[in-house]
Amino acid sequence: MPPKTKGKGRKAATRKKKKNSSPGVEAEAKHRLVLLEKELLQDHLALQREEACRAKASEDRLKQRLQGLEAELERTQSEGRAVYAEMSRQRQALQKELGTRSKRLEEEVRGLRERLETCQREAKTAREEAERALREQDGTLTELRAHVAHMEAKYEEILHDNLNCLLAKLRAVKPQWDAATLRLHTRHKEQLRRFGLNPLDL
């Protein structure tokens, strides 16, 4: 826009000169004016081309930047999708593993509960059998003690009867033994005297 202002100033000066000049000078002034206008148009076109080039370069840079941003956005989205897919895969794998582990643990717990119930039943049965065996043993011991006490009483009675019978027999045969002993003693004394021995010296 300064060139236009400059042109206007020249036009005004030319007009002033036109009033005070001859026709030849006026033609020359018009020619100069045309040249100036042409120069101004050329400068204006050059400025427009320069501005257009700068705008085109700026547009190209913006397009390039936009393409870079779009590519980066696409790469980021692709990475995000890849990360999401990987996380989904890992989550599914983890859920599957947890499901398998949970199922295995449930089966182990079920098996342990069954074993515990079996052991409890066996322990209860063994305890009942042991208690029954102890009761039977106590009953048997009681019967044996009673039988032993009865046998001891019987044996003691038989022993006393036998001893009494033996004593009675001894008392019955004692006079006979005493007489036999006396006869034997007398016979020995006579035999000793026969051999010239004194029984009192022996």
From Swiss-Prot:
Keywords linked to the UniProt accession: Cell projection, Cilium, Coiled coil, Cytoplasm, Cytoskeleton, Flagellum
Organism: Rattus norvegicus
Feature: compositional bias, Basic residues: 1-20
Region (Disordered): 1-29
Full protein name: Dynein regulatory complex protein 12
Family named by the database record: Belongs to the DRC12 family.
Gene Ontology cellular component annotations, sorted alphabetically: cytoplasm; cytoskeleton; motile cilium
InterPro entries according to UniProt: DRC12-like
Function: Component of the nexin-dynein regulatory complex (N-DRC), a key regulator of ciliary/flagellar motility which maintains the alignment and integrity of the distal axoneme and regulates microtubule sliding in motile axonemes.
Subunit structure, as described in the record: Component of the nexin-dynein regulatory complex (N-DRC).
Coiled coil feature spans: 54-149
Main location: cytoplasm
Subcellular location(s) of the protein: Cytoplasm, Cytoskeleton, Flagellum axoneme
Lineage of producing organism: Eukaryota, Metazoa, Chordata, Craniata, Vertebrata
